[in-house]
């Protein structure tokens, strides 16, 4: 059975257009680079690494260090819960859509982080970024009806490979379009990471 055709831009919600995701994944890449380069050498745009590091510390018997990783994971969980709870109440008022309100909130949140002193514990920024990255990941889920992530690139790599094979095997133009869309997301994530690294040097 053929996959449904990807909708044209004019038929999509603004928050589902590809350019929105291009901006959001650049922000997601910046989050990871920011906390890794400037705030303690950890990635806060996703949680896989935190659980791996927690397991490593448990294996070494460092219980205190292991338990620390529950803090960013809990912040990430809280961000998901809130971003599931709020949209229904905000959209019901029909003043502004949740995704629009979230972008304004995210900008204010990151702006406020800029006032955290350089000598403050890095955990403050780590937890704050975990929280907001989780909300972003949960709020922006698809572009042009293609499931996408805006804070990490693992799925984008898988989708590039999968759609490349579909395109080469059958000449499917839709698969080719999806492949290039995911490839664009990877490039933007890498570019924002590299830009943050150079700015911090």
Q: What are these language model-derived features?
A:
Residues 1-14:
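Short, Lys/Arg-rich, polar N-terminal cytosolic tail immediately upstream
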Residues 26, 122-147:
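Hydrophobic core of transmembrane alpha-helices in multi-pass small-molecule transporters
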Residues 190-201:
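Single conserved hydrophobic/aromatic residue that forms the stacking wall/gate
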Residues 20-42:
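Pair of pore-lining "gating" transmembrane helices in MFS-fold secondary transporters
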Residues 96-103:
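Cytoplasmic-side transmembrane-helix entry/capping segments in multi-pass membrane proteins
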Residues 109-118:
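C-terminal ends and interior cores of transmembrane alpha-helices
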Residues 82-92:
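Helix-to-loop junctions at the C-terminal end of transmembrane segments
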Residues 24-28, 71, 75-79, 83, ...:
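Alpha-helical transmembrane segments in multi-pass membrane proteins
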């Amino acid at each position: 059975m053929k996959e449904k055709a990807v909708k044209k831009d004019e038929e999509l919600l603004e928050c589902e257009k590809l350019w929105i995701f291009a901006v959001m994944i650049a922000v997601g890449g910046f989050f990871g680079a920011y906390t890794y380069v400037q705030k303690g050498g950890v990635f806060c745009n996703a949680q896989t690494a935190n659980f791996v590091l927690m397991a490593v510390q448990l294996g070494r018997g460092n219980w205190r260090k292991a338990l620390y990783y529950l803090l960013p994971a809990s912040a990430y969980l809280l961000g998901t819960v809130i971003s599931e709870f709020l949209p229904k109440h905000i959209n019901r008022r029909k003043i502004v859509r949740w995704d629009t309100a979230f972008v304004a909130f995210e900008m204010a949140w990151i702006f406020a982080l800029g006032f955290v002193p350089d000598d403050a514990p890095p955990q403050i920024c780590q937890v704050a970024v975990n929280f907001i990255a989780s909300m972003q990941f949960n709020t922006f889920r698809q572009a042009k009806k293609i499931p996408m992530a805006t804070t990490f690139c693992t799925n984008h790599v898988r989708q590039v490979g999968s759609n490349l094979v579909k395109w080469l095997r059958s000449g499917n133009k839709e698969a080719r379009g999806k492949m290039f869309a995911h490839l664009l997301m990877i490039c933007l994530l890498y570019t924002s990471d590299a830009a943050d690294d150079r700015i911090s040097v």
